[in-house]
Amino acid sequence: MISAAYAATHAAAEHAQSGMPQFDSSTFSSQMFWTVISFVALLLLLKKFVVPAISDVLEARASRIEEELKAAENERKEAAALLVDQRAEVKAEREKIAQLLESARKEADALREQEKAELEAELAKLKSQATQDIEQARRQAMSEVRGVVVEVALAVTEKLITKSIDKAEANKLADEAIRHLEANKDQLH
């Protein structure tokens, strides 16, 4: 039995030597020591070189993001101010255009009224002139008709009554005939 126990432990020792050294219990203490030393050295190296570099990068990135946010906020404020200014300018331009349109409309109305008044005055003048021309032509025609009527009346009267009528009597008869014609001129047409 002893030899069987010896053989089992010897086989386990051989197996441990031929296997992974991490599982060899005789080297646990030295492995733990060097693992702790390596870990502490790694932490010190990380703290000394890597963490400050990462911290600097993160701080730089944070400050850059903060600056970009401030710049974006400033640009937003400027854009809002520009928008307000643009809206005010657009409103002012619209009011100006409305005033120009109203002024142009009033000016066109005034010009139209002036042209209308001038045209009406010209038409009244032409009507008055035409009325005067017609009246003058009527007088002239009546004068010519009167002369012809007097002569015809004289000739007819002389032939009818074989009595001579003087010029004054003939004018009186002609005036009477003309008054009769003027009074009945609507019936003649």
Swiss-Prot record:
Keyword Ribonucleoprotein carried by entry: no
GO cellular component terms listed in the entry, alphabetical order: plasma membrane; proton-transporting ATP synthase complex
CDD domains assigned to the protein according to its UniProt record, in alphabetical order: ATP-synt_Fo_b
Topological category with respect to the lipid bilayer: Single-pass membrane protein
Superkingdom of origin: Bacteria
Keyword DNA repair: no
Segments crossing the lipid bilayer: 32-54
A Pfam cross-reference name: ATP-synt_B
Database matches in InterPro entries: ATP_synth_b/b'su_bac/chlpt, ATP_synth_F0_bsu_bac, ATP_synthase_B_chain
Keywords associated with the record: ATP synthesis, Cell inner membrane, Cell membrane, CF(0), Hydrogen ion transport, Ion transport, Membrane, Transmembrane, Transmembrane helix, Transport
MF-aspect GO terms: proton-transporting ATP synthase activity, rotational mechanism; proton-transporting ATPase activity, rotational mechanism
Compartments, as annotated in UniProt: Cell inner membrane
Predominant subcellular localization, coarse grouping: membrane
Function noted in UniProt: F(1)F(0) ATP synthase produces ATP from ADP in the presence of a proton or sodium gradient. F-type ATPases consist of two structural domains, F(1) containing the extramembraneous catalytic core and F(0) containing the membrane proton channel, linked together by a central stalk and a peripheral stalk. During catalysis, ATP synthesis in the catalytic domain of F(1) is coupled via a rotary mechanism of the central stalk subunits to proton translocation.
Family per similarity comment: Belongs to the ATPase B chain family.
Subunit architecture: F-type ATPases have 2 components, F(1) - the catalytic core - and F(0) - the membrane proton channel. F(1) has five subunits: alpha(3), beta(3), gamma(1), delta(1), epsilon(1). F(0) has three main subunits: a(1), b(2) and c(10-14). The alpha and beta chains form an alternating ring which encloses part of the gamma chain. F(1) is attached to F(0) by a central stalk formed by the gamma and epsilon chains, while a peripheral stalk is formed by the delta and b chains.
Protein name as it appears in the record: ATP synthase subunit b
Lineage per the UniProt record: Bacteria, Pseudomonadati, Pseudomonadota, Alphaproteobacteria, Magnetococcales
Gene that encodes the chain: atpF
